Amino acid sequence: MISLQIVKIPIERTRVLRENTKQIEKNANVKLSIEEENVIIEGDPYNEWRAVDVIKAIGRGFPINSALKLLNDEYILKIINLKEIFPRENQRRRYLARIIGTRGKVKKKLEEITGAEICIYGNTVSVIGRLNEAALAERAINLIIKGLGHSSVYFIIQKEKMRMLE
């Protein structure tokens, strides 16, 4: 049974998608059509469902190699939209800056601790990782959004990671 899904991505990310269409089609076993910011995915429902996350990840700024990990059932995509949390732009900018850190240090440290990949694009913070990794990264981001200090967040996340490994 062939079905159809439509996913919207930012127009400026369609170039990256166009350059990698064949690779995605081959790996996900789907057919892609790109019309401005709309991406039409055709294939069997399961492959379509997996390809939707790959397209969303590319739309949220991830490189193709990171996005293709989502074809593996062990990996998930989490998207946190700061526009839904903070109505004012100056608030969003401040919290995005806290998540990124000076020269990307906070983001890099969170990726090291959790094992997940984090991408900031527009008003969103997105995470790709295995279930536990993505959940830890999402928790860390939410703690930063709640206003906890970076060192407290690192401590809490490292402790939770150790508990998961037991």
Residue ranges and their predicted role:
Residues 1-166:
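Predominantly single-stranded RNA-binding modules in RNA-associated proteins
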